[in-house]
Amino acid sequence: YSMIREKFGLNEEDGKLMAKVARRSHQINAVYTWEKFQAMGYLWTMIPVINKMYDTEEERIAGYKRHYELFNTNPVVGGFITGLNTAMEMQAAKDKEFDKASIAAVRTSLMGPFAGIGDSIFQSTWRVITMGIGLSLAKDGNILGPIVFLVLFNLLAEPCRILLPYVGFKMGSKFMLQAEESG
């Protein structure tokens, strides 16, 4: 992750935090409930951010509650939203006037579009193509069929899962800086 940190121009502290967020965002879909969908995974992803940014128990609990709301998007591209919300949480911790409700508003407004893009690319197209290749091998009893499917699918999905949280963080940080400078 240090190479990615350098590529995005992050200091070591922010780079380590974003590495945790990127790794944890892989598990966004691990606990899926019909009440809040991926909220548990989203909260799991944001816990290192909340713990780092806020000192008091009250602030941390408020942060946990803020991120344990309905969340449902494509798990491959959803990391962008976690990165963006990380930048917003960092700004909120620095600026007591920051409207923390905007963090949830941004998350909620991006869930649908990212689900549409991610599902179209990964679930409806790329998965079907790679599954077809894997199945064509497996139908003749070739053990490489499922392996080829997993390798091919993740050749595209894994870089997105790793890099998109950084992209979201960088874009969010840039936006927060511009907003702060413009007043």
Language model features with spans:
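Soluble N-terminal domains of membrane-associated systems
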Residues: 1-99
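Solvent-exposed, non-transmembrane amphipathic alpha-helical segments
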Residues: 42, 66, 80, 84-87, ...
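Glycine-centered flexibility motif
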Residues: 41, 80-83, 89, 112, ...
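Membrane-embedded alpha-helical modules
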Residues: 125, 129, 136-183
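Loop-to-transmembrane-helix entry motif
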Residues: 67-74, 113-124, 182
